[in-house]
Amino acid sequence: MFILDSHCDAPMQMIRGRDYCKDNEGAQVDFPKLRRGGVDASFFALYIPASLKGADATAHAYSLLSETTRQVERCEYASFAADAASVRANLEEGRISVLLGLENGSALQEDFDILCDLYAKGVRYVTLTHSEDNQICDSCTGQGTWGGLSPFGRELVREMNRIGMLIDVAHCSDATVRDCLEISDSPLVYTHGCCRSLSSHRRNLPDDLLSAIAHGGGVVGMSVYPCFLSDAYASELESSGLKEGEWDKMMELPSLPGIDAMVSHIMKAVEVCGGEHVGIGTDYDGIEVTPRGMQSASALCLLPRALKEAGLSSSLIEGIMGENFLRLL
């Protein structure tokens, strides 16, 4: 079965020194784990921390791109892809396709030339913001600076439509998502998140926005992040006082959800959006804790069986696991 992950943070770990050609103990993603998990294509996100602004943010994006290029070119069974045809070609040759996204449009500054250059270098979606409001729009964890899209953000949406760059509304405020739905002539993507009706995390989207993205032809990618999956776990983690890096202790908390919680969010998204508008966007390598039994990308091959046991048809499962996003791409 073809499997596509619409969001992982591999470049961030690459630039920190991880060799993705090796099977790294305790890592969530590397090329051997992608192969074991049956993952045929994965979007590697060029993540820009909110603390970086202007030229510093842009320089960081290009540094991530350079290191990602170096490592992909070293792996004999991985190759870049920029469209559905190249993904299919890689698949026929037994290669994992690495696609590129930019996470946090602050790296664009207010310069469409940077946008077009990144597109020419293979970047196919831009996550408009991250953990803070930026020059484009409000974040779901921001201060509501613009009340949605900024004036530049509205111009950017139109320019992204023009060049064929996908607009990713993960991390956006509800008001930003509504503005994008109103302005964009092309389908939106929500590359990594879950259903707010099942778990109240601010990064999750309410049913009406999930439905509106689907109605516009877009795809919503369900994440594996436990705090998106379970309010009980998010609450227990917060009260535990555990800090970043205490991964083993986070995994030992009794409320840690498993694959069944991810299946529940996928099933809810199918109910709200229709099965042809749901995908998988794990957020691996960008999260400090994973669901029980899904510690790495090597476990993604377990998901189709779990969805079948939940009652989904083979054709719906094939769409969710990757064909839906590939169709949009």
PLM region descriptions:
Residues 19-36, 302-305:
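Short catalytic helix/loop segments, enriched in acidic residues and glycine
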Residues 2-5, 40-45, 97-100, 125-128, ...:
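Structural recognition of the beta-strand scaffold that forms the well-ordered cores
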Residues 295-329:
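Mid-to-C-terminal alpha-helical segments outside catalytic/metal-binding sites
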Residues 7, 34, 83, 122, ...:
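Conserved, mostly hydrophobic/aromatic
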Residues 10-27, 47-59, 109, 133-149, ...:
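Acidic/histidine-rich helix-loop elements
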Residues 222-224, 273-296:
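Short acidic/histidine-rich active-site segments
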Residues 28, 33-112, 128-133, 137-162, ...:
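A metal-dependent hydrolase metal-coordination microenvironment
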Residues 110-120, 124, 142-189, 202-218, ...:
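Histidine/acidic residue-rich metal-binding segments in metalloenzymes
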